[in-house]
Amino acid sequence: MGRAKKVVLAYSGGVDTSVCIPYLKQEWGVEEVITFAADLGQGDELEPIRRKALEAGASQSLVGDLIQPFIEEFAFPAIRANALYEGRYPLSTALARPLIARRLVEVAREVGADAVAHGCTGKGNDQVRFDVAIAALAPDLKVLTPAREWGMSREETIAYGERCGLPAPVSKKSPYSIDLNLLGRSVEAGPLEDPMQAPPEEVFAMTVSIDAAPSEAEEIEIAFEAGNPVSINGQRLDPVALIREANRLAGSHGIGRLDMIENRVVGIKSREIYETPGLLLLIQAHQELESLTLAADVLRTKRQLEMQWADLVYQGLWFGPLKEALDGFMDRTQSEVNGVVRLRLHKGNAIVTGRGSSDSSLYVPEMASYGSEDQFDHRAAEGFIYVWGLPIRLWSAARRR
């Protein structure tokens, strides 16, 4: 008896997920494999991917356009949370996984499957994200993980596929592992595994190099409503179009490249190259607007919780109770985050040159000014400082007894 009768496989068209199709049927006795490929704005032509799955033995090959929910339900909450894993990585890949898992479960219910499957290996983060998300959404569904269990090297995996009649991958000579969607690209493996080796220019596709970036700076304005970006340079855009425009603007000035050593969920360190031009630009602008519109204690608390929010998403806990609770806090703070931020884009840098809010700003010029319009009561400072410093004076006096 096989491990499952009908399986829905998360499918990318790559080597591992293509080999998963015959492997599930021949080695694990699965009767029927249905594939699902998600369109997340990665720019791939999905019809060849759909046909490839059928040629590999899938009974059905489904494709789903998830671009709009990806941006509205996953990217925008990350912007509102200023989500940067380990202070740098804006979770461009991690944000896609819970959405794919959610749709995978929905497809499994629609076709009456008793299991879902993915092609993640045992060393990466995505296996955790898929398995935990599926467990949260459908604990009754079995999760099959052939690539984690088959113990084959990449060369052996390709050879297995060729024995099953699959064509050799076009990218067989490429040493890199690449994941991409509308938010960005992640590149790893090959020569990048040496942390001292500079990444070659060939690994980048969404951003120009600093040398190739324009010598003349460009100023732009980004407007936010309730913490969500809504327009660039006065042009109101739908969420997907806004991300595309932010990618274009930032990428054309060499903004959005990351080269970092990150701590994976499974306990190892890995070297990752990321390109996330638009997302990093929007988070920077959003942070700046919050500094103008949020009360000091709210802002400090939010900065602490942002790190935890990013950790939860990175670790695959999107559908967990703590993430849900933090969402409530984040959403409550954003009603006041309305306004415009101006940035100067130049040679890999986005420099804030202005910020304003007509209805939410907590910056009061008359209180901050040192000129004749100053309305701050300087005489009140003496009493405030006395009370503020009283614990220190009492502590100091006690030490001298």
Curated annotation (Swiss-Prot):
PROSITE patterns on file: ARGININOSUCCIN_SYN_1, ARGININOSUCCIN_SYN_2
Residues involved in ATP binding: A10, Y11, S12, G13, G14, V15, D16, T17, S18, A38, G119
Keyword Protein transport included in the entry's annotation: no
Residues where L-citrulline binds: Y89, N125, R129, S177, S186, E262, Y274
Keywords: Amino-acid biosynthesis, Arginine biosynthesis, ATP-binding, Cytoplasm, Ligase, Nucleotide-binding
Localization: Cytoplasm
InterPro entries named in the record: Arginosuc_syn_C, Arginosuc_syn_N, Arginosuc_synth, Arginosuc_synth_CS, Arginosuc_synth_type_1_subfam, AS_cat/multimer_dom_body, Rossmann-like_a/b/a_fold
Known pathway: Amino-acid biosynthesis; L-arginine biosynthesis; L-arginine from L-ornithine and carbamoyl phosphate: step 2/3
GO molecular function per UniProt: argininosuccinate synthase activity; ATP binding
CDD domains according to UniProt: ASS (cd01999)
Annotated Gene3D superfamilies: Argininosuccinate synthetase, chain A, domain 2 (3.90.1260.10), HUPs (3.40.50.620), Single helix bin (1.20.5.470)
GO cellular component terms, semicolon-separated: cytoplasm
Main enzyme class: ligase
SUBUNIT field: Homotetramer.
PANTHER family assigned: ARGININOSUCCINATE SYNTHASE
Record's protein name: Argininosuccinate synthase
